[in-house]
Amino acid sequence: MILPSILLLVAHTLEANVECGVRPLYDSRIQYSRIIEGQEAELGEFPWQVSIQESDHHFCGGSILSEWWILTVAHCFYAQELSPTDLRVRVGTNDLTTSPVELEVTTIIRHKGFKRLNMDNDIALLLLAKPLTFNELTVPICLPLWPAPPSWHECWVAGWGVTNSTDKESMSTDLMKVPMRIIEWEECLQMFPSLTTNMLCASYGNESYDACQGDSGGPLVCTTDPGSRWYQVGIISWGKSCGKKGFPGIYTVLAKYTLWIEKIAQTEGKPLDFRGQSSSNKKKNRQNNQLSKSPALNCPQSWLLPCLLSFALLRALSNWK
């Protein structure tokens, strides 16, 4: 358990000004019961979760990366006739029937390598018309840790999608959540021969927990320790029906696309770094660039733990000065 703790210390040092992946309003943990077979999420439990809507109808989920950017999947925008001006993004709420905070979209950017046949490269970005205002109910999610931890302590998905796999009209107006466990890629390949290395699988043992229609684009979020930051590991993409026992859901592996996200954000003039931090402040940009070039981040595998310890100590001393 030492390595994940060190990783979190480094992440916290790097992201002290970002406050991504935190849940300021959600201060208690409740046990899940038995969106398929889900439980209603608590207010502020997933403050990075957004509803993507057309004509006031929810059709896909997404997550907040920064004040300008929403992350989702490409297949939600496969219909060429869908215009950015038709979209609204609702933030800061679990209940879609309440008076919403809605934001307009100026640009839809699908990954050019998206393949509808096998759902490879199923990722997209939405550029907002105006920047988000962060608060207790509106918080960006952290992008994946580097290096990846050996295991995640806890993972969840949430959404407003179908809650009954036999009734496609059973869309929820309340945000529902289900626990998830990431499955070994080789094991999942046996069930899904079309699986690519840009995909991961997640389920919860033999339970029928799953995402479904309307949940696509929502985040799979994980944490390494209780009470620590949350990181988006995957994006809800596809699966074999909904909640079918023995068949996990398929998610886009977010770690494969951090460079793509950064490039798109820079091209559009609204850059962010790998952790979802806005880079409008040039001073912070320079600091992040220096950190990215630090020798401690290029250590041999055998020296990883000592390097991370040294790096965290140096950063703490630097901040103290």
From Swiss-Prot:
Q: Which gene encodes it?
A: Prss55
Residues with covalent lipid (GPI-anchor amidated serine) sit at: 294
Q: Which named protein is this?
A: Serine protease 55
Q: Does the keyword Protease apply?
A: yes
Query: Which SMART domains does this chain map to?
Result: Tryp_SPc
Q: Which PROSITE patterns match?
A: TRYPSIN_DOM, TRYPSIN_SER
- Cross-referenced PANTHER family, in alphabetical order? ACROSIN-RELATED, SUPPRESSOR OF TUMORIGENICITY 14 PROTEIN HOMOLOG-RELATED
Q: What happens when the gene is disrupted?
A: Deficient male display infertility with impaired sperm migration from uterus into oviduct and defective sperm-zona and sperm-egg recognition/binding. However, the mating activity, sperm production, sperm morphology, sperm motility, inducibility of AR, activity of acrosomal enzymes and in vitro sperm fertility are almost normal. Male show an absence of mature ADAM3 in sperm.
UniProt-recorded Gene Ontology molecular function terms:
serine-type endopeptidase activity
Q: Which organism is it from?
A: Mus musculus (Mouse)
Compartments, as annotated in UniProt: Cell membrane; Cytoplasmic vesicle, Secretory vesicle, Acrosome
Superkingdom of the source species: Eukaryota
Task: Give disulfide pairs as residue numbers.
Answer: 60-76, 155-222, 188-201, 212-242
* GO (cellular component) term, any one: acrosomal vesicle
